[in-house]
């Protein structure tokens, strides 16, 4: 079976290629520039065209049995025009799905985001039956892409992962790692809000699982570790991985909220101080197994 992966050199793409090869698939990686580092031996590297050009994809889809679509503009929070999110994440994804349908591709797995369903915080545990309420251009572009893909004739599965962690991740997780490495006590013991996270390896396993499970066709799934964690638990797990005790002390949450407002970064408080729990039960019910101990997984990650 031949699988074409877009975004193959990215954070999820790297472990996914290994998982697909380990399962015996012939893997084709669509890349926009020569990959660094070089992709695993046996991966067929093909030039990835502009996402918005459906016609340019047709030659690359000949003989392909399944497409895993990872490529897109990530949620950066700043500096990306709304129209750019729509062009790449919605229009580009829809163009690829239409091209795959015309080429007779049998499966299409679209990696969306929990932000297609919710803002950075939610008042209840999210499930797939909730009405989607994205709060930013990134989330709206992903939700619109889901609808456009469903409107094609291709058998598709949509995955909505929460924030991920794993080797090589930058952004917020990397900032927390740098914070955990400081030889200082940290004032986060009082932040008890919980957030769902997702091991990148578990994400790769989820993609492989839905490819191998026909009853997931036509469905949308939240992807998350089994148990949400607090920021205090995350930092304690990180410090355990580098051989330190937690060294956390309490500071009232209101102080963090005021500090974030003072520097014009209320988005930081939304991400760190808000609660976002996403329930992966639907995907688990059809046989997928998540990471059950997020704290231990983070400790292992930093200890490696």
Task: Annotate each language-model stretch with its function.
Residues 3-23:
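N-terminal Rossmann NAD(P)H-binding glycine-rich loop of SDR-like oxidoreductase domains
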Residues 47-91, 99, 116-117:
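NAD(P)H-binding glycine-rich loop region in Rossmannoid oxidoreductase-like domains
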Residues 94-137, 157:
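Conserved Rossmann-fold NAD(P)-dependent oxidoreductase catalytic core, especially the SDR/UDP-sugar
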Residues 133-157:
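Active-site Tyr-X1-5-Lys
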Residues 140, 169-175, 189-211, 218-222:
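Substrate-positioning beta->alpha
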Residues 166, 188-194, 221-228, 237-243, ...:
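Glycine-rich Rossmann NAD(P)(H)-binding loop
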Residues 209-268, 299-302:
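Mid/C-terminal beta-alpha module of Rossmann-like enzyme folds, strongest
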Residues 292-304:
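Amphipathic terminal alpha-helices
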């Amino acid at each position: 079976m031949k699988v074409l992966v877009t975004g193959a050199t990215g954070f999820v793409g790297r472990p996914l290629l290994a998982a697909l090869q380990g399962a015996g698939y012939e893997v084709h990686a669509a890349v926009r520039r020569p990959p660094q580092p070089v992709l695993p031996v046996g991966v067929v590297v093909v030039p990835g065209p502009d996402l918005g050009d459906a016609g340019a994809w047709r030659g690359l889809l000949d003989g392909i049995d399944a497409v895993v679509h990872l490529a897109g503009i990530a949620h950066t929070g700043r500096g990306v025009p709304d129209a750019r999110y729509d062009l790449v994440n919605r229009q580009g994804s829809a163009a690829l799905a239409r091209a795959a349908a015309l080429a007779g591709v049998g499966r299409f797995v679209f990696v969306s985001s929990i932000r297609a369903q919710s803002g950075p915080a939610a008042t209840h545990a999210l499930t797939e039956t909730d009405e989607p309420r994205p709060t930013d251009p990134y989330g709206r572009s992903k939700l619109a892409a889901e609808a456009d893909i469903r409107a094609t004739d291709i058998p598709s599965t949509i995955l909505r992962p929460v924030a991920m962690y794993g080797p090589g991740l930058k952004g917020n997780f990397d900032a927390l790692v740098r914070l955990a490495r400081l030889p200082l006590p940290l004032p986060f013991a009082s932040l008890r809000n919980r957030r769902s996270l997702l091991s990148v390896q578990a994400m790769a396993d989820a993609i492989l699982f839905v490819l191998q499970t026909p009853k997931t066709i036509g469905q949308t799934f939240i992807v998350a570790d089994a148990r949400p964690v607090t920021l205090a638990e995350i930092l304690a797990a990180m410090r355990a991985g580098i051989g330190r005790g937690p060294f956390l002390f309490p500071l009232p949450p209101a102080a963090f909220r005021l500090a974030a407002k003072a520097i014009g970064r209320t988005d930081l408080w939304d991400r760190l101080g808000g609660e976002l729990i996403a329930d992966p039960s639907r995907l688990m019910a059809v046989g997928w197994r998540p990471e059950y101990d997020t704290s231990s997984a983070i400790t292992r990650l930093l200890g490696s």
